[in-house]
A protein has these predicted regions:
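Glycine-/charge-enriched secondary-structure boundary and capping motifs
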Residues: 1-127
């Protein structure tokens, strides 16, 4: 059930060889809600799509939220929900990023996009 923290140094080094990484966010205590806004520049907002549920380890996080009586929104405020690292890139680098992550056998999912918005730094869409 529990695994040691994933160390992403080798993955990030591989990515940075050919991809312009804009921001990197390690999701730790405080979950996505507290950590991601810290790396979003002023005037920008990260739009995250959780409408399909948890992107990784869905059964595990469904069990935790059920037993703890927490909504998925509350879960994203406390846990990483299976998302250990968020890498923000330019959209033009998407295909290259996917290729590199597959090459190093790093599971990934596209969570959303960064848009212009001066009113907030994070918006999460829930199902």
């Amino acid at each position: 059930l529990l695994k040691p923290t994933k160390i992403y140094v080798s993955v990030v080094r591989e990515l940075s060889k050919s991809i312009s990484v804009k921001q990197i966010c390690h999701i730790t205590g405080g979950g996505i809600v507290e950590n991601l806004p810290r790396v979003i520049p002023n005037g920008k907002c990260a739009h995250i799509d959780f409408s399909g549920g948890y992107p990784f380890h869905k059964d595990l996080f469904d069990l935790i939220s059920s037993k703890a009586n927490l909504t998925i929104k509350e879960m994203t405020e406390v846990f990483n929900c299976g998302v250990g690292l968020i890498v923000i890139i330019h959209p033009a680098d998407k295909a290259n990023l996917e290729y590199k992550l597959k090459k190093v056998r790093q599971p990934f999912v596209r969570l959303g996009k960064v848009v212009n918005d001066k009113t907030k730094k994070l918006e999460i869409q829930f199902g």
